[in-house]
């Protein structure tokens, strides 16, 4: 199995199928469309293509794509849409092992953390519908379950016929309270009507009942203070009254419209022969050795006989569109200048809107970005509008529904470790959910990022601004926040059910504390209010927001809403997406903001990473900001070196011979000739208007002189730049996707070494002290000489063995087929590189080689920056 990845077969689908824009395929059958691969927001593809939203979903061989960071089994919204909107169940076709993993995902996203399911029951009227009656697929708990009867194989009855496109959009955005099993809102209104028509005797009886309810409520609230989990209590400040800590389990269950995840879906499992029987007439065959699925169904021959026909052949490893991250230099050569305090909306809609992205935004503080619930491919979105995502160094994760966390995992795998801000409860759900999807341990996932835990009831300083976080009213633990900076403030609601009637009802039932009720009903005294207006009953009804005073609506921007559901003449407005619509608040900059800007920029420069804090003062005193207009020459070839530069904004192009590289914020240039001597070897020109941080020659040498690590870094880099290391990395299937900064960091840990023909690189059983990038020649594994040889661009090395401490032993023996050249990397250096580049670490994980691009076509690096 060590070499299975090299032997895996990739082919194009064949037969009758529809390819989906976001990835995956839909194959027609007697049972309706069968979808293979389930990427985030996949139902939007069906809606946009005007095809029926499938009820049968086949999970691919790998549930998560390491290359793109995309979840290939995002089954949440297909299940939600079919269950809540179309009133029917879905069927998931997969292996037994995949079923167990998917159940963990739905546990977290539908029911919340396991400790939230202690058996508490919310008393209310119920009219639960058996939705399984409308499902065309019978529940099968194992692959040996009997096939469906002919009656069960029939399409859904007319009442659940697939709606038209217009009906789908209306259904997906209407008030779905009539789907809600508990009818909380209706109960409040009914009670109000009854109170107006009762007799005096009944009024007295009602008053007595209300007094009794109040006593029971107080008693229940006293009991709740001891019911709350001890670990959950630790998320609240020591000054937060223990009696006022919310019972989120009760609040979540009040909003929940089901009692078990099995109400939403069934599983159909592949048997030991790789066959999943959907019915007597329809089967899916999984041929693992060929990496494919086959859809087969029986057709009548006309003589009472049936013949099995092949409908389609689909790859079992779904390829998703690879969003090549490139910084745009269009838009009149202007580069985005982030506000000191403001918001850039990436997406403003929800998971059922085919025309818009799910809600997520960048909160700008001191020109640094904090991404809140990043939508999928959010970095590509920003870069397409001229915003380097290196400007974003924090993520706020509000909760673990797919429309809010799908892009979070992807964002964690980008350049540098990012800081995640959320509560331990929400982070725990996130790690369990994505640990199950990726099949990686939660310990490993936790090491991919820096965690800053939220403390409820206590101010938190992030990027110089003061944050206060709260738990909202939602079906799983969710946070919102308010942030204060420079005399202005922004409030973000997060996903919440802001409905005064229901909030009061929760208090009346003893589900919500009175102090918490008053908190949610308080006025919004903030400069800007960013509030959700999603699909009730678990979101905020637009009618409630429409009734707000005009003074509030002037400061209110809506998210989590589709455009066609905004009532005309309501005085409400949807937050506009894109950099051009960035909302900037006029605030006074902090007296330290300039120094912070410089230090944050210098922090990203490899050369300065080993510089002690005691030299920070020297850096601040010697750094100078310079501006260059578009087209200006910053450095001319064959001139005397006089300064070192760090890009602060804009894009510059470095031209060395035939090699061109675009550099962006945090990239640097001009260091080589300062340290190694000689004239400038490159031309550097401003592609856009540019601002750089410059250090003159004497100051730069003074800062780095006493740092052995800095000098060694530059020396190694100089040696590798005289090699063809950059071109060689561009031939590797993983390194080719690295940013310029990452490639530079890799160059600094490589050492050239000549290997003779038939020389052994390492033997099986030896300690894994190094790996290598093949620069010239070729190598083979003795354990499997039937493989093609590994040539230029291939990386060889047992990554798991190299990255344990101390390194463990090699499982293979590698021999040179001819005289070769390698770029050697020590295990200890690779570990350090991985710690700063978690996405590359995951791409290498569990490998003994990372193959060269099979077509050996070198990626061009002179048109756009791969980022």
From Swiss-Prot:
Entry keyword annotation includes Repeat: yes
Enzyme Commission designation: 3.1.4.35
Protein keywords: cGMP, cGMP-binding, Cytoplasm, Hydrolase, Magnesium, Manganese, Metal-binding, Nucleotide-binding, Repeat, Zinc
Family annotation (SMART domains): cNMP, Lactamase_B
Keyword Repressor annotated: no
Subcellular location: Cytoplasm, Cytosol
Top EC category: hydrolase
GO cellular component, one term: cytosol
Bias kind Acidic residues: ranges: 221-232
Catalytic activity: 3',5'-cyclic GMP + H2O = GMP + H(+)
Residues where a nucleoside 3',5'-cyclic phosphate 1 binds: 607-721
GO MF annotation list: 3',5'-cyclic-GMP phosphodiesterase activity; cAMP binding; cAMP-dependent protein kinase inhibitor activity; cGMP binding; metal ion binding; protein kinase A catalytic subunit binding
Names of the cofactor(s): Mn(2+); Mg(2+); Zn(2+)
Activity-pH dependence: Optimum pH is 7.0.
Biased composition regions of type Pro residues, renumbered to the chain: 147-160
Entry's Gene Ontology BP terms: adenylate cyclase-activating G protein-coupled receptor signaling pathway; aggregation involved in sorocarp development; cGMP-mediated signaling; chemotaxis to cAMP; negative regulation of actin filament polymerization; negative regulation of phosphatidylinositol 3-kinase/protein kinase B signal transduction; negative regulation of Ras protein signal transduction; positive regulation of myosin II filament assembly
Annotated residues for binding of a nucleoside 3',5'-cyclic phosphate 2: 734-851
Free-text cofactor note: Divalent metal cation. Can use Mn(2+) or, to a lower extent, Mg(2+) or Zn(2+). Half-maximal activation occurs between 10 and 100 uM of Mn(2+) whereas maximal activation occurs with 10 mM of Zn(2+) or Mg(2+).
Domain free text: The beta lactamase-like domain catalyzes the hydrolysis of cGMP.
Family: Belongs to the metallo-beta-lactamase superfamily. cNMP phosphodiesterase family.
Function comment: Phosphodiesterase specific for cGMP, which is activated by cGMP but not by cAMP. Involved in the degradation of intracellular cGMP, contributes to the control of cGMP signals.
The protein's name: cGMP-dependent 3',5'-cGMP phosphodiesterase A
Record lineage: Eukaryota, Amoebozoa, Evosea, Eumycetozoa, Dictyostelia
